[in-house]
């Protein structure tokens, strides 16, 4: 099955702004996701990020399940990845969508379904 991976990516201008102390919704959401150890806020944060168009499609991965998507996105093999743009390793807050439109977010422990 083909899965699409979405990540919240920063532009160079956003990085410069954050470095200069500017507020950033992207950074706030990513920080909140990373600190949501119980996973209680994760889905709500993803919904905000989706509504604000903060996610960018970065890759399509051929895999049999979400765990394999996570593995391939972090250690390969590269032959199972079609890159759509600059991609970091798969981590907390990344969104994974299957061919049927089912979405899951990478949580601190496993995955959470996103409506």
Annotate the PLM regions.
Residues 4-7, 11, 38, 56, ...:
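Compositionally biased, intrinsically disordered low-complexity regions enriched in proline and serine
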Residues 1-39:
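N-terminal intrinsically disordered, low-complexity, charge/repeat-rich segments that act as generic
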Residues 85-115:
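Short, compact, well-ordered microdomains
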Residues 36-95:
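Short, conserved turn/kink motifs that form compact alpha/beta structural patches or helix kinks used as
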Residues 17-19, 83, 110:
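General "foldedness" signal
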Residues 8-11, 15, 42, 60, ...:
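Short linear sequence elements within intrinsically disordered, low-complexity coil regions
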């Amino acid at each position: 099955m083909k899965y699409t991976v979405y990540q919240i990516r920063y532009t160079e201008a956003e990085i410069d702004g954050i470095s200069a102390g500017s507020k950033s919704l992207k950074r706030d959401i990513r920080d909140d996701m990373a600190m949501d150890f119980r996973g209680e806020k994760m889905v709500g944060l993803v919904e905000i990020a989706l509504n604000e168009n903060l996610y960018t499609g970065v890759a399509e991965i051929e895999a049999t399940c979400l765990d394999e998507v996570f593995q391939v996105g972090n250690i390969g093999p590269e032959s199972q990845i079609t890159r759509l743009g600059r991609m970091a390793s798969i981590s907390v807050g990344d969104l994974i969508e299957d061919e049927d439109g089912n979405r899951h977010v990478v949580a601190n422990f496993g995955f959470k379904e996103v409506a």
